[in-house]
Amino acid sequence: MGFKVETNGGDGSLVSAKVPPLANPLAEKPDEIASNISYHAQYTPHFSPFKFQLQQAYYATAESVRDRLIQQWNETYLHFHKVDPKQTYYLSMEFLQGRALTNAIGNLNIQDAYADALRKFGLELEEITEQEKDAALGNGGLGRLASCFLDSMATLNLPAWGYGLRYRYGLFKQIITKEGQEEVAEDWLEKFSPWEIVRHDVLYPIRFFGQVEVNPDGSRQWIGGEVIQALAYDVPIPGYQTKNTISLRLWEAKACADDFDLFLFNDGQLESASVLHSRAQQICSVLYPGDATEGGKLLRLKQQYFLCSASLQDIISRFKERRQGPWNWSEFPTKVAVQLNDTHPTLSIPELMRLLMDDEGLGWDEAWAVTSKTVAYTNHTVLPEALEKWSQPVMWKLLPRHMEIIEEIDRRFVALISKTRLDLEDEVSNMRILDNNLQKPVVRMANLCVVSSHTVNGVAQLHSDILKSELFASYVSIWPTKFQNKTNGITPRRWINFCSPELSRIITKWLKTDKWVTNLDLLTGLREFADNEDLQAEWLSAKRANKQRLAQYVLQVTGENIDPDSLFDIQVKRIHEYKRQLLNILGVIYRYKKLKEMSPEERKSTTARTVMIGGKAFATYTNAKRIVKLVDDVGSVVNSDPEVNSYLKVVFVPNYNVSVAEVLIPGSELSQHISTAGMEASGTSNMKFALNRVLIIGTLDGANVEIREEIGEENFFLFGATADEVPRLRKERENGLFKPDPRFEEAKKFIRSGVFGSYDYNPLLDSLEGNSGYGRGDYFLVGYDFPSYMDAQEKVDEAYRDKKRWLKMSILSTAGSGKFSSDRTIAQYAKEIWNIEECRVP
């Protein structure tokens, strides 16, 4: 092959052998694939020519896979251009892709051939895939959902694209020190990404600031300000065992050479010479920059508008390219569906109006008809702080033309209410888009989405019911058919087939087919074998292997030895008070205290447990960071306690991301989804755990409700208040009627005793005290749910001691997870919201 590889830090020298200057993108035989890898190592060089170590091998391997993807990608693009189907464009501020190599060769069904090819270099596929860094383009469930959706769109052969931003440093890389969480820049692009292709011919101008000029004919034009260029980077998204390969187009911000002032530079005014270049770099530097200052708010708003404007200019350009003029704009909604993933891309609405009116010459009514038939909105939260509201003065400063359009949409909506719904006059102030509060006038982005979109959907049945009965109830009375539910889903390719191959092989063996990978409903066939001893033995063996793999990972990243014979109990998600990691760790603290009080003989009768918690706390979210610190401090004490550490260990898993999840989820046995009822829109990690035969302890919140229905109530450890009880319980708390459980008080007192160190946890614990007030009054009902949570944990211990019962419950969990495929979700979006159809590449 021309290469000799050493993986133990040796020279890894290149040996002399001629490599033909020709690649075969469609190679499937190991010898041909190995030749392709050699070709890229020599003719697509990124490193010194006389070394071929693991990183070089990874990049050469990835580029050989990319060749094949580009071939399919081009065929897909040309086929879509020829057929000209209606196409969906999915706009999201986040795409949490994870590693691409395993996913690509898995979807292309060439993983075995690649494994054999790499062995010819003395390499294992797994050690090559470990070289890839996760693309830092997202943070949590919002971005991961978007990525699952892209996988399903491609697999279902749907004409669709994703649009996002190419963040240089992501959200942040999380480091855990004695001081708690520290944030450093994520360096995923330190070298480069072999999966993206820069499109130097796809460049759009994006204007900020400036003023609006009224032309003699009454038309309006946005002029002046500063103009940044949006440059496209394309990432191929292959479908599973299909030629269809769609695009995730990411935008990078850049300034032109003309914006560099050579005179100032040569005059020594170095920073002033490149002001616009610096501002352009800031736009895509990090995901969700801090917005405590006006500068931070402007930057976040710039990011959102940059995504919307670049994407819509690109969409319009493609519409024109396929229609080849003259263009009938009334046909635009029959060819284009724009889906807003939460409120971040809301500016797509006024931007599409602006482009149609100011650039294409449409009148208001025609532009509004096109826009309102094109755009649909997915709501992901009922949390007040997550329903975006932008300062009107900031909006006027940055986007003056858009504020004019938003004002007009608001004016017309208020007029509609006044004319047709006098019964809603008392509600108008809350329903309208503009909140003109003199102290703090804002634009309500969710309201703008609801008024302007043809469809609004929630992401779990409970969440959608809350949207219709509470958050958007007044709108429902005007547009009852506008609101839908689309329960979220996950891609079974990444989340079981690739991340847990042992389990996948067992499922295929017992179902006698592998078609479940694209038809997850077939998993119900496992139910008849739930009591089968042979299946249970195989099930247990595969779980054991995954637990050992997880234990090795934890040792590698934390230095902590954990026992694979203990119950692996995991909660991994963004750190937030409503997700109640605090409830989890308080339960752990109470368990630790009780273990300390037991005799050695009594401890032997308990269920040994390893509790793992992971997730990032936003840098400015103080209480969330205190929770991270508390978990780590508890772990330091518990894990070094020789009396207890054989029965309980606590680990904070740092820098949680997709690749970490692919190790944690298959190795888990119990998963905690314990948010305050009514506050989690859906959640998708619960689906990933349930699919991977992990039992759930949780509240009746989000998708937990539907998971429990599907897998069977007896296979779900339920606790806590229900969503309809929460308002009453908060009111009772305000009125001083809450009486805390003694166990809850005991756990808090134990923290305050200083046993976990000298850090001041009083501000965190104070949030659980009192009856009302900012940062007090236990808004998330940790104290109320604590006793039922502890009771449910006792039931977990009891069930785990009965191995046959636990295995049966585990099998039934996987068997009941068929509903939660993103293929099902996307098929429903395609039929019921987007009105698009399959467009398979022949």
Curated annotation (Swiss-Prot):
Q: Pfam families from the entry?
A: Phosphorylase
Keywords associated with the record: Allosteric enzyme, Carbohydrate metabolism, Cytoplasm, Glycosyltransferase, Pyridoxal phosphate, Transferase
Name of the top EC class for this enzyme: transferase
A cellular component annotation (GO) from this entry? cytoplasm
Just give the chief location class.
cytoplasm
- Per the record, the domain of life is Eukaryota
Q: Name one GO molecular function term.
A: pyridoxal phosphate binding
Q: CDD domains from the entry?
A: GT35_Glycogen_Phosphorylase (cd04300)
Q: Which reaction does it catalyse?
A: [(1->4)-alpha-D-glucosyl](n) + phosphate = [(1->4)-alpha-D-glucosyl](n-1) + alpha-D-glucose 1-phosphate
Q: Write out the GO biological process terms.
A: glycogen catabolic process
What EC designation does it have? Answer: 2.4.1.1
PROSITE patterns, per the entry: PHOSPHORYLASE
Q: Which cofactor does it need?
A: pyridoxal 5'-phosphate
Q: What does this protein do?
A: Phosphorylase is an important allosteric enzyme in carbohydrate metabolism. Enzymes from different sources differ in their regulatory mechanisms and in their natural substrates. However, all known phosphorylases share catalytic and structural properties.
Q: Which family does it belong to?
A: Belongs to the glycogen phosphorylase family.
Report the protein name in the record: Alpha-glucan phosphorylase, H isozyme
